Amino acid sequence: MLKFLKKEANMTHTENGAVTYRSTQSECLDLFATIGALRRERDEEITNRFLRAYAEDADLAMKTLFFARDIRGGIGERRVFRTILKWLANNEPRSLEKNIQYIAEYGRYDDLLVLMGTTCEGKVLHLIKKQLAADCAALEAGESVSLLAKWLPSVNASNEDAIRQAKQIARSLGMNDAQYRKTLSALRTKISIIENNLREKDYTFDYSKQPSKAMFKYRKAFMRNDGDRYDEFMSRVAEGTEQLHTGTLMPYEMIKPFFGRGDISDQERKAIDATWKTQEDFTGGENALVVIDGSGSMYGGADPIPATVALSLGIYYAERNTGAFQNYFITFSENPKLVEIKGKDIYEKVRYCHQFNEVANTNIQRVFELILKTAVKNRVPQKDMPAKIFIISDMEFDYCTEDCSLTNFEYTQRLFEEHGYQLPEVMFWNVASRNQQQPVKINDQGVALVSGCNPRIFSMLKAGILSPYAFMMDVLGSERYAAIVA
């Protein structure tokens, strides 16, 4: 009886009436599958999801948290990380204290500042004092320093909370305001923070050495105040003779300026296109197909808009795809459409591809039926079928019209089997987890669950996929997260 009761209690429906699961049957996997898709959710919702995972397996929950923040090897989520850090400080401080030393390594030094005013404040101040002393010694020796000084608050900041926090940190370091300001100024000069140059209208810096976020954020200032030199640099980037950092810049951030505004200048188009083309290729050369959700629910009031994230990832992958589906993706809402990317630059490509979004319902069933119907009609051999299908969506699918008692994945498995085809590996990529529901369960075969805005996820999915849980363990069990424990 208990077995059947658990099964029944785990069934729910999407916003569009499809049968689906409340949980994968693993709280940790539920968190892993959605932690990159919680940007629009309330703090309480975020911490509740983490709490459940922590209760199931504290170590896995902590590894998932640091994977979510990891700007070099993970998915680079800042707000969800900081929200959970504060919850840990108030509820599981000992667990958090074991990992405080890794916070800046996986994220930034200012992530630590959310712990001020909590029971972990002393540990944070001790770490800051230790690192600042090491940086000052390195400065005197002419060696490189950390980015701590960049992210510490200034005593002359415009924000009152930042000033109050800066004064508190200064006193804990045994410094008055002047000493603190002088120390940070010297270290920031060594770091060569571009904001200092902009404030002083000093455009003698090297563009190739600037961080990716700053280069994109301040592009208008560069065009306005250093137009010729900036143009020349971006031209060299486009030619491949100059380096432009794009490591922490997400694809959606690059195309976001194309929406909700008037004309964009030729100069800005050229700069954004060069930036787009400089992105690292995480695709891996598989014969895979990207399917992006263009339904109405993908246009909810979030920043970023889920539809923009999905479109950016779809174009990113299709352009770099070396398989049979190079330069193609499928967009779906009421009716799936195979879209060939057209345009001379990323601005034109986005404008062209975006108009295929129907902004209607979310009929994923028709996507798989289109793929299978095409294969059957043309007697396509299994080897020519896509090896993987990436479904980038909010997972609020329509119900199966053929059998509304089945989940979409169950229906698709049965459909392919009935026609003698093996279902390609399916990657459910969540970009907006509004509800606690999952399209598959923990041990379903040939499927993975991921989330977020980061194209690095494509590289994690290169190998053969066994099950959602196996994929999660492959990621979190890597050497990268070995030191993170609860």
What is the meaning of each model-derived region?
Residues M1-V309, E319-A486:
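Long lumenal/extracellular ectodomains of secretory and single-pass membrane proteins
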